[in-house]
Each structure stands twice: as C-alpha cells, then as structure tokens.
Amino acid sequence: MLTLKLISEQTERVIKGLEKKHFNGAREAIDNVLAVDKTRRETQQKLDKTLQEAKKLAAQIGALMKEKKTDEANAIKEDVAQLKETSKALEQELAKAEQDLTTLLCTIPNIPNDDVPEGKDAADNVVVKEGGVVPELPADALCHWDLCKKFNLINFDLGVKITGAGFPIYIGKMARLQRALEAFFLEEARKSGYLEVQPPFVVNEASGYGTGQLPDKEGQMYHCNLDNLYLIPTAEVPVTNIFRDVIIDEKELPIKRCAYSACFRREAGSYGKDVRGLNRLHQFDKVEIVRIDTPEHSYQSLNEMLEHVEGLLKKLELPYHILRLCGGDMSFTSAICYDFEVYSAAQKKWLEVSSVSNLESYQANRLKCRFRHTETKKTELCHTLNGSALALPRIVAAIIENNQTPEGIRVPKCLVPYCGFDMLDDHNF
C-alpha cells in the first residue's frame, strides 16, 4: 500500500497518479485518508499528554505518601484514576483510527510510474518491441484444440468429467512437453542467477494480504474455507512472502528467486470464444521470477527481467511483441507493467504469456520488507518485482499452432534435450 509519507508530502502527485489509473473517487479517497490520519495523530497526542500527566501525578503521590500526607495523596489518586479511564478511551479511539486508516489504504492502488502511458484499457497499450516471424500456415490449418484432439495430446472433456471446465488432462508426449517446458524455464532462470525455491501451493490470509491479492482479488482465488487457506494464483505470492517482516542487509540485494508452481484462478465470469482450449484455464503451470531490490537499482532489475523473458521467447522461436500497459489496464499493485504476447497463427490472435512488473515500495510496505543501508544503518522499504517466465498454456497453444505439420507438431529445438523427442504426435510410447 502507499505510504502515509508519500500521500501527505506529495498529495497532488498521488491523486494525479490514481486518476491516471482511472481509480474512481481518487481525490475523495486521499482526502479521507488525510482526515483519518489527522484524527489518528490528534488522538495520539491526547493520549501521550494524558499518560504524561498521569505519570507526573503518580510521582506526586509517591512523594506525598513519603511525607505521610495521605489525604492529599488520595485526592490525587482519584485524578489519576480518571486519567486512566480517559487514556483507555483514547487507546480505543486510536486503535479504531489506525484500523480505519489501514482499511482505507488497502482500497487505494499503487500509482503509476511516469513512463506509463495514458489510457483507459487494453486498446491504449503501447507496443514497444516486436520480434520473431509469424509463420504462414495453409488454409486448412487447425487451432490447437483441434490439433490436440487429432493427435490425442490433451483431453478437455475428461477434465470436465473429473473436475470441471478449465482443468484439462495432458496425455503422453504432451505431458512430457509440459515437464520439459518447466525444466527449460527453470534452468534458464538458474543460468540468469535466480535461486530456485519450491513453495507451497496454498497460503494463509496474511500472505495473500502481503502481496496484494487480498482484499482486492479474493473473488478470483480458490478459498479452502475449512482451514482459511487460499490456492495460489501465482508463485509470486509464496515466494515474495518469504521476505515478509524481514530486514535485509543492503549488500544482499538484489535478491533473485524463481519457482515453478501450479496456479489456480477462478476467472469468474469468463466465457465465449476467447476461452476455448488452452486460452484460459482455472489451473495451469507457470515459472515465476521474483526480485527484491533497492529503489535506486530496481529499474535496472526490471530491464534485466524483460531481457530474460524476451530471451525465452526467442529460443522458443515464437513471434512476440512487448506491450507497455497504460494506466487504466494496469494491475492494482503495479507501478509499471509490461505484457509479452505471442502470435497464435491458427487463431490469428495475440496471446498474453507473461506480465513483468515493478511494484516499487507498494508491496513491500504491506509486507514490511525493508533493507538496512550499509553506511547509515537506516532501514528503508525495498522495491519488489515479479514476472512470468513463462506461463505454459498459451505458450503451448502457440507452439502447437505455429509448428503444425500433417504428421504432427514440430518441437522447438531448445526443448528437445528436455523432452527427448522432436515431434508431438500420437506415438506416445
């Protein structure tokens, strides 16, 4: 969440940033925060003054008792008792003001970086780079869901039988290709200096709050009511929460972590032609990269993450472009975000396969993730960054469609050492 220091010292900048994100009622929300913070500070001052007065009178009581001036001491005791009652009431008022303030701050998104373009939705996103070659497919080219049926690679109907829509069954060589992609992505991350971790796939409420999924996205998360745990929508959640309530030595930054996980998203309300096949699933596999860094270095880290993801797409030989998201299309927590999309030649559409974001100090403020300066020993909020490197379903869809032949689907050369075959077909054994 945004810091009170930022809101109070740069109020107009914050309001303009929220308006750039098309956050309704930006000025009213910030005015409410400042008003509640004023109440909190005034209540704190009253409480401090009351406690100081009670302490002063308590000292007088001690002195009077030593002088055996019992009546005077008893009279002051009544004043102290009244001050204690007042302090209790003020403590309750202070606790309420602090809770109200936290609640308000949690409803306010991060403000965008100056480089974020103006815009309301995806139509206003800006293409900043393109790469790869769009293949020319024959007129009778099939979409990936038809190819998967033809070569017995994925059974969508069986997934519906077992669980429901959006939970496909991967078969034979396709199951092996899934593992190959995960291994390839993790190995490439390791080569780039990321330490692999294997996190839980369920998290508690504090973890969901720390990374900003709660209370903003609880409707999109699967909730295990009995234990009050949530299935993760991305490995960003457990990996970043490793550093919750942690003070990191400056010399240890940047911290680089990567993790494979299954991801679970309800995607409530999703339907229609854009969700066919692998285009939108409730469960999918993804490799996530996460960085913790200093404010001075975080944008260099962002550029390195963008280069890493782009390198993966080049090795997979997929046509891609990189979008800088406009203010209105950005997530709740991000300060700047880049989407990578690959071209699905049979569907004739672009599919998002990665989002790479710098959240600056917004997430770290919730997480209480700080670093200690080497020279001054003072602590400061870290910057957190994350990105998909990569999400599998749409990558698989593009590989299947773009590399289709009458005999099967050609496997990208970089994956052959990981899966042990160069053609996806129904010869599964």
Model feature map: region roles:
Residues R27, E130-F429:
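TRNA-recognition modules of translation machinery and tRNA-sensing kinases, especially anticodon-binding
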